[in-house]
A protein has these predicted regions:
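Gly/Gly-Pro- and Ser/Thr-rich, intrinsically disordered tail segments characteristic of DNA damage-repair
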Residues: 1-227, 235-237, 275
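DNA-contacting surface of Y-family translesion DNA polymerases
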Residues: 8, 176, 183, 191-328
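Short, hydrophobic secondary-structure boundary micro-motifs
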Residues: 75, 339-340
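Feature marks short, surface-exposed loop/turn motifs that line or immediately flank catalytic pockets
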Residues: 149, 295, 338
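Conserved small/polar residues in nucleotide/adenosyl-binding loops
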Residues: 329-337
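Hydrophobic alpha-helical segments, chiefly the membrane-spanning helices
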Residues: 340-346
Length: 346
């Protein structure tokens, strides 16, 4: 039986928490990172937990957020600052293991197999990581500990903020079974709506569906969903091996065709990629952008640069040029509402 050595570390309300840390007057107040005022175009990039109590959440139009919470304080996105703090967090994680797979600016997987002699059990490592992040960066993180990346990620989201959830080996399916189907990694609103037609409300309901039914309805994704519902995930933490590529990915919870929002997201992704290149002392010669819609249709475009680079500006310029046709293809229309958009920069 596999041991629970996979950790998923997720910073709590990252952008908003950084702003509240750096600006004491914002602490304890509902804030939305994403624009200077309610009149700005665009959406909320991050909401503090005080704002979430009013129903404000990421990807919500700024005007809507202001209506829900009249006392909401708006703060402009500072991608460079968040990128710097992200690098500090990842440096802390690498003190415990070289097997760190950063999957976004504010979250990463770790495989702590082999780290126990120096740092203790996986649960002790998780507690230590949380304490160090609070002590050194004045930020909180939620951590899930499990045998697989899939289950660890679900676990980290169950007790936010500042949570720690451990799923013992052999209990993955039982842990997932009572959770709403929306908790399962990769299931969005559109997929959940289709599953609801078959009476699926929980992850356990999905696990009970016949494999052939899932294959007929979802094609090649059917077997994948069946395995995920049982907590089965064989993907390794990629940081355990020398990386041949550096990537960042962002999933939009709500459809958007707002050019400002898309450009801002690409800038944050570009800063994350360039920062990791500089941290690793390497440069990229090829830039690729991958966009996947809710039907699992993927569009990928790439470009070889004249000279290798580790600069945010170069990565961002190439990413914008590459992304425009992809985003035009996947932009939502009244006849084709997308469940979500995934944009990945490599």
């Amino acid at each position: 039986m596999s041991r629970a050595t996979i950790l998923h570390v997720d910073l709590d309300a990252f952008f908003a928490a950084v702003e509240q840390r750096d600006r004491p007057e914002l602490r304890g107040k509902p804030i939305a990172v994403g624009g200077g005022s309610a009149s700005d175009r665009g959406v909320v990039s991050a909401a503090s937990y005080e704002a979430r109590r009013y129903g404000v959440h990421s990807a919500m139009p700024l005007r809507t957020a202001a209506r829900l919470c009249p006392e909401l304080v708006f703060v402009r996105v500072d991608g460079r600052k968040y990128g710097r703090v992200s690098k500090q967090v990842m440096a802390i994680l690498r003190r415990y293991t070289p097997a760190v797979e950063q999957i976004s600016i504010d979250e990463a997987f770790l495989d702590v197999h082999g780290s126990e002699i120096l740092h203790g059990t996986p649960t002790e490592i998780a507690r230590s990581i949380k304490a160090v992040i609070v002590g050194e960066l004045e930020l909180t993180a939620s951590v899930g500990v499990a045998t697989t990346k899939l289950v660890a990620k679900v676990a980290s989201d169950l007790d936010k903020p500042d949570g720690l959830v451990v799923v013992p080996p052999g209990e993955e399916a039982a842990f997932l079974a009572p959770l709403p189907i929306s908790r399962l990694w990769g299931v969005g609103q559109k997929t959940a709506a289709v599953l609801a037609e078959f009476g699926v409300r929980t992850i356990g309901d999905l696990a009970a569906l016949p494999d052939d039914l899932l294959a007929r309805r979802f094609g090649k994704m059917g077997p994948v969903l069946a395995l995920r519902a049982q907590g089965i995930d064989t993907s390794p933490v990629s940081g355990a091996e020398p990386a041949r590529s550096v990537s960042h990915e962002h999933t939009f919870d709500i459809d958007t065709a707002d050019a400002e929002v898309l450009e801002r997201t690409l800038l944050a992704l570009s800063e994350g990629v360039a920062g990791r290149l500089r941290h690793g002392g390497v440069k990229a010669h090829t830039i690729a952008v991958k966009v996947r819609d809710s039907s699992f249709h993927t569009v990928t475009r790439q470009r070889t640069l004249p000279e290798p680079t580790d600069q945010t500006e170069d990565v961002f310029a190439a990413a914008c040029d590459l992304a425009r046709p992809c985003l035009l293809y996947t932009s939502p229309s009244p006849r084709d509402q997308r469940e979500h958009l995934v944009c990945r920069l490599l």
